[in-house]
Amino acid sequence: MARKMLNDGEPDLKKGEEQGKVYDFDLFIIGAGSGGVRAARFSSNFGAKVGICELPFHPISSETIGGVGGTCVIRGCVPKKILVYGASYGGELQDARNFGWELNENVDFNWKKLLQKKTDEINRLNGIYKRLLSNAGVKLFEGEGKIASPNEVEVTQLDGTKLSYSAKHILIATGSRAQRPNIPGQELGITSDEALSLEEFPKRAVILGGGYIAVEFASIWRGMGSSVNLVFRKELPLRGFDDEMRAVVARNLEGRGINLHPRTNLAQLIKTEDGIKVITDHGEELIADVVLFATGRSPNSKRLNLEKVGVEFDKAGAIVVDEYSRTNIPSIWAVGDVTNRLNLTPVALMEASLFAKTVFGGQASKPDYNDIPYAVFCIPPLSVVGLSEEQAVEQTKGDVLIFTSTFNPMKNTISGRQEKTVMKLVVDAQTDKVLGASMCGPDAPEIVQGIAIAIKCGATKAQFDSTVGIHPSSAEEFVTMRSETRRVTGGVKPKTNL
């Protein structure tokens, strides 16, 4: 958990409710992203009368622009994955030559065509999400929602008309927004919102950040032929992931032609005739067509009227909730990125589902944040579940066993691509329980999703070893790693500043 929550207890659902009062809605939700839509549908299925509001649709968000489907569908996971697919074909076409495919003519990449296909898809999904709400009997309002009181929401429509609705429960699911660094010339840079909708393909890109968004866009643009410089403050990208796997990702990025600038920050951006001059804190100068800021996200909570109502939030603007997603105001709840617990779409879906189950389904249910799988859709991708080696060493009292496998995928032996797949298991030496798994290589997210089930169920290394593998496949390596790579003493904090 990234932040301290309110003390929890079995929620008293009558608390905060005015006895005998008739409300317009049992539940009113502010924000129709992944979490909001899931909470609306599930609550309605439990018999609740539900209203939900969302800002007008546009691919690029602002304080007054959003869209049903939220960040993931409109300007996040989905369009990004489409671009990752598009970028992957460049390497695939090159690799195809040794498999007998003769590419006699130049293969041109059409950015505008891909962009239009991406836009068509998010428009389609936006429509699907609206239909899901309608089919569930949820009333959708387009406009900006604010909390007027513990049981009242005000919705400002496009024409300025203000609508007011009472609700027994209010759920905040407004998500988060990309941050910008406070440096001279920052207005010349863009965030991931704009990066997904650029009218012209950037031939030269500078990316600030070492997180998954930065790494993914570096892979996307490089895969499409751009010159990419990735600037980040640590020694390795992807802080918080397993250090060994971070090094693998860094090696792969460099192997595909991305220029890495570790322990570096941006000092200034200057507009020139040739593009944008980027000056680093080391005095190095780079020229770019696009500068992408991938420096984190902040909760969308500023315009909700939280202070007036008395809803508690932290310095970053994240709404503080208990283990049932309830705020300090009994009738007001919050899920997803706006709470800054674990900012992933599947986590928001989990929180929303359990909120509905708690409030309207008669079963008080807490989200479980243990053993949640992650994926970084760089090329090739990284996927992990459970504890990293560093986390296991710090949290485990006894020794920790590390099993690794590094190999050249069968496909690469023919294509000639020099890029190893790396897989890793972290095991508690005393209990034999598999604490974590990592993989960097083709299809890693698809493979690790299956491994996540085993780890969630508490599988041991012996059970992994007794499982018959699928041959030939990369996945079978997870059940054939017999010899430990190293044994590490647990209960100590690893010395790492990577």
UniProtKB/Swiss-Prot annotation:
Free-text remark on how the cofactor is bound: Binds 1 FAD per subunit.
Active-site positions on this chain: H471
InterPro entries named in the record: FAD/NAD-bd_sf, FAD/NAD-binding_dom, FAD/NAD-linked_Rdtase_dimer_sf, GSHR, GSHR/TRXR-like, Pyr_nuc-diS_OxRdtase, Pyr_nucl-diS_OxRdtase_dimer, Pyr_OxRdtase_I_AS
Cofactors (names): FAD
Annotated glutathione binding sites: S34, Y129
Pfam families for the chain: Pyr_redox_2 (PF07992), Pyr_redox_dim (PF02852)
Cysteine pairs bridged by disulfides in the record: C72-C77
Binding residue positions for NADP(+): G210, I213, E216, R233, R239, G296, A375
GO cellular component: cytosol; mitochondrion
More about this protein: The active site is a redox-active disulfide bond.
Record family assignment: Belongs to the class-I pyridine nucleotide-disulfide oxidoreductase family.
PANTHER family on file: GLUTATHIONE REDUCTASE
Protein name as it appears in the record: Glutathione reductase, cytosolic
Native source species: Pisum sativum
